[in-house]
Amino acid sequence: MELMKQLEVWFLVGSQHLYGAATLKQVADHAHTITSQLNERAGLPVKIVLKPTGTTLDEISAIARDANHDQRCIGLMVWMHTFSPAKMWIPALSQLQKPLLQFHTQFNRDLPWSEIDMDFMNLNQTAHGGREFGFMGARLRLPRTVVVGHWQDEEAHRKLGNWMRVAAAIHDSRHLKIARFGDNMRNVAVTEGDKIEAQIQFGYQVNYHPVGDLVKVIDAVPASDIEALLAEYEESYTLTEAVQAGGVLRASLYEAARQELGMKKFLTDGGFGAFTTTFEDLHGLHQLPGLACQRLMQQGFGFGAEGDWKTAALLRTLKVMGTGLAGGTSFMEDYTYHLEAGNNLVLGAHMLEVCPSIAADKPVLDAQHLGIGKKADPARLLFAAPAGKAVNASLIDLGNRFRLVVNQLEVVDLPEAMPKLPVASALWQPMPDLQTSAEAWILAGAAHHSVFTQSVDIEQLRTFADLMGIEFVVIDKHTRIPELKQTLQWNEVYYKLCH
């Protein structure tokens, strides 16, 4: 995903003319040094662009206006090097439409004990200048992120990078187009939702596209392109005998390749970043898209089965956040339980559509019977997720607000092989335990579909919820049901009073 390379975070340093030209030059020099060092050595995912020092209301306001209109700018990072009276910032902060981060740092790490004088004190005032700025953020009720620490510290770099990833995901969501091939699975509740409110809140453009329109594109894929993709499959995966050249189900693999190429063309040509399918609307398709959905997810597209556009959008968001990080992200469903005493586990899977970015080993490519959908045997990749930390995330519509529910997981290795299971899977212990996790998930109303990720963490998801202005509920090792119930009740009152 090349998105990050095209984006910028603007760095605006606050000061004022009270201190004179010499001090302002030092402020500008320090800001330039910090910018260049962060860009070169901090491993940040997005380039920082330094703007002129903000010393007046008009200067600061102009930069905020420019940030709003510049499509490369995903957010504004501010630092109060000296004291910068916050009334100068009111128009800028009131009109800013991009994520805001206050970097509460200072140029020097240590106090120059034997040399410190009032010139030094007047130059390095972030300790109280940052508090002045913080008051205005609170007064304006601004969603914002604060990172505290020296600009050379790795922990500060990590937090800056996390915020940049969230800002990039928000930037992407503001322009996200989601193609719904078919409608929601009939009579299912949680996959429904208010698409207008979703566009107001997140920017999601969710629209229906007839499967017949997609079929026309799939049917027009050249045979030479299909053969080239089959060669890629053979190089990337371990093919079962049935789908190898001359195998009894080679035609199913051929059709899956045609589907992938056609679906990718439809999505790319239409500027879509996410899509949904449904097994109840496959008119003109020879098989339920399985392999195509798996591989399109791996290429960065969001996906939701059975018309689940909210999960498709959230998956795309996490794909953007996790760009370049270790671990993968996939559509997922809590499918079935292992209820052995002292070793409760959840087996996550879906009919076909689990992203190979979470595969522990080289996937196996096969085609097998699938009764749901009543079509030909679909191709699919088979694999298991690696052991390690993970998160499940679910975005739901509660009528008066969206709620993002996340559950901390510990993925474990399969204790035994599952040779008859024809789908990819992940096996995990939910935190703090299955009983508490499942009860909390159900009380919070989270969906049976989720986004499973081993690259994005709870901190990033919390920041996303904060900046998007949506409710956030976390289930982790500290969760206790009585406290969770209280939190849900308090949240209900808060959102009715304040939104």
UniProtKB/Swiss-Prot annotation:
GO CC term (a single one): cytosol
Associated pathway: Carbohydrate degradation; L-arabinose degradation via L-ribulose; D-xylulose 5-phosphate from L-arabinose (bacterial route): step 1/3
Name of the top EC class for this enzyme: isomerase
Catalytic activity field: beta-L-arabinopyranose = L-ribulose
Cofactor: binding details: Binds 1 Mn(2+) ion per subunit.
Keywords: Arabinose catabolism, Carbohydrate metabolism, Isomerase, Manganese, Metal-binding
Residues that, per the record, bind Mn(2+): E306, E333, H350, H449
Protein's recorded name: L-arabinose isomerase
Provenance organism: Aeromonas hydrophila subsp. hydrophila (strain ATCC 7966 / DSM 30187 / BCRC 13018 / CCUG 14551 / JCM 1027 / KCTC 2358 / NCIMB 9240 / NCTC 8049)
The organism's taxonomic lineage, starting at the top: Bacteria, Pseudomonadati, Pseudomonadota, Gammaproteobacteria, Aeromonadales
